[in-house]
């Protein structure tokens, strides 16, 4: 940071407080940046900032020159490291029930699995909810075979990043933490060896006729 810059830190459960504080500073004439990991519009701060603006009746907030700059979300970063597992239709689902009922998550998982969509899971597990990934996998296994490919990307783009490919039959909640992005392949997702000893994972662009 430069000497004239000030950092305002909050934890990940204070998004709305951070967004409102940013508008208060910006409305007073300060230049403000709300920093968010990944892409700010994907399970990140852009939605909180817009929600704060939408709820506000402060005319000064409405006059703030607000811009949202895209980034690389964890699903895209992990997919790029693995190859192209998101090469066909896919969906992104947060398994956190902090802001939505678990019943809604179950419904979305059921329909996504039945539609044979590739799925990328954000917030797959935490100390407060260690059971949810296991419950999600039970739903998915009703529609997907044990040989379905799975990609686990942990801290992709950061020091110490790890990438692992395994099958749905091999996946257990113990292999995942809150910093892991989980990609569940479709029936068409496949893999083949790389010359360096690794492997590529991709989902073909076409889908066989039903």
Which role fits each region the language model picked out?
Residues 21-28, 80-84, 105-109, 163-169:
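Short, surface-exposed amphipathic charged segments that create phosphate/polyanion-binding patches used
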Residues 14, 18-21, 45, 49, ...:
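General structural feature for long, well-ordered alpha-helical segments within catalytic domains
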Residues 41-115:
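Class I SAM-dependent methyltransferase SAM-binding "motif I" and its flanking Rossmann-like core
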Residues 13-18, 74, 98-100, 157-160:
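A short acidic, often aromatic-flanked loop/helix-cap motif at beta-alpha or helix-coil junctions
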Residues 1-66, 209:
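Class I S-adenosyl-L-methionine
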Residues 6-9, 66-68, 92, 150-152:
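Conserved beta-strand scaffold positions in the cores of enzyme catalytic domains, especially
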């Amino acid at each position: 940071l430069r000497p004239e810059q000030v950092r305002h830190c909050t934890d990940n459960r204070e998004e709305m407080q951070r967004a409102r504080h940013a508008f208060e500073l910006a409305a007073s004439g300060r230049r403000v940046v709300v920093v968010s990991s990944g892409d700010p519009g994907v399970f990140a701060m852009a939605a909180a900032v817009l929600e704060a603006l939408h709820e506000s009746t402060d005319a000064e907030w409405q006059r703030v020159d607000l811009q949202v700059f895209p980034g690389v979300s964890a699903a895209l970063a992990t997919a790029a490291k693995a190859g192209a597992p998101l090469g066909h239709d896919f969906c992104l689902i947060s398994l956190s029930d902090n802001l939505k009922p678990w019943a809604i998550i179950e419904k979305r998982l059921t329909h996504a699995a039945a539609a044979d969509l590739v799925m990328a899971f954000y917030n797959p597990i935490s100390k407060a909810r260690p059971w949810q990934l296991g419950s999600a996998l039970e739903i998915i296994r009703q529609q997907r075979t044990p040989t379905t490919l799975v990609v686990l990307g942990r801290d992709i783009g950061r020091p110490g990043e790890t990438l692992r490919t395994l099958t749905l039959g091999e996946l257990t909640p113990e292999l995942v933490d809150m910093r892991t992005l989980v990609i569940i392949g479709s029936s068409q997702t496949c893999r083949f060896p790389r010359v360096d000893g690794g492997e590529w994972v991709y989902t073909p662009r076409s889908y066989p006729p039903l």
